[in-house]
Regions:
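Acidic, proline/glycine-rich intrinsically disordered inter-domain spacer in sigma factors
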Residues: 7, 78, 83-109
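DNA-recognition helix of helix-turn-helix
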Residues: 65, 69, 136-162
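Short, aromatic/basic-enriched loop-to-helix "N-cap" motif that marks the start
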Residues: 48-63, 140, 145
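Short, charged helix-capping/linker segments at alpha-helix termini
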Residues: 1-11, 21-39, 47-55, 164
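C-terminal flanking helix
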Residues: 17, 21, 41, 112, ...
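Arg/Lys-rich amphipathic alpha helix in sigma70-family domain 2
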Residues: 62-82, 97, 160-161
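Short, small-hydrophobic-rich alpha-helical interface motif
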Residues: 20, 24, 33-44, 60-63, ...
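A short pre-motif secondary-structure segment
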Residues: 118-122
Length: 171
């Protein structure tokens, strides 16, 4: 018996939801990630008859990214860093690691949305330029530009943190 569209949709959601949540979390932060995922799944469900659910990963990623970017465009949206305990050898090292992670997250959060989305998909999802271009509805050269500029801006933002850290350590 052939699987129905609804069966394939449910299977796709079960199979991909953890990865999609990670993408949403990387783009909008943990506070809004579940909302982004739920809205993306709802949008897909409402239009499930339109799509081929035999290979849904790309469609689902693109929908989550689009929903995350839509949410970021809303003026009241602010990013919140995750509060995961650090895994360090000592409490002091753990505090330093947590501070660094928090600064990286803040720096990523301050990037323009397309730079942030491209970086997340490239660095966290290990997607190719072609895949990122498909998800973000852009050309491959545009994706390369976003990645280059995003990395450069991220490095500049983190350099300020590193310089500040050196001053604190020198005291």
């Amino acid at each position: 018996m052939a699987e129905t569209t609804s069966d394939l949709f449910e299977k796709a959601v079960r199979l991909h939801s953890r990865r999609l949540l990670a993408i949403a979390r990387a783009i909008v932060g943990s506070a809004a990630a579940e909302d982004v995922l739920q809205q993306a799944i709802l949008n897909l469900y409402q239009h499930r008859q339109r799509y081929d659910w035999t290979q849904p990963a790309g469609l689902m990623r693109r929908t989550v990214v689009n929903e995350a970017l839509r949410l970021l465009r809303q003026p009241r949206m602010s990013l919140v860093a995750d509060d995961h305990p650090g895994r360090a050898d000592s409490p002091v090292r753990g505090m330093i690691d947590d501070e660094m992670i928090q600064q990286v997250r803040k720096a990523i959060a301050r990037l323009p949305e397309h730079f942030r989305a491209a970086l997340v998909l490239c660095e966290y999802e290990n997607m190719s330029y072609v895949q990122i271009a498909e998800v973000l509805d852009a050309s491959v050269p545009q994706v390369k530009t976003w990645l280059h500029r995003g990395r450069r801006q991220l490095a500049e933002k983190l350099k300020a943190f590193a310089d500040e850290r050196k001053l604190k350590d020198a005291k």
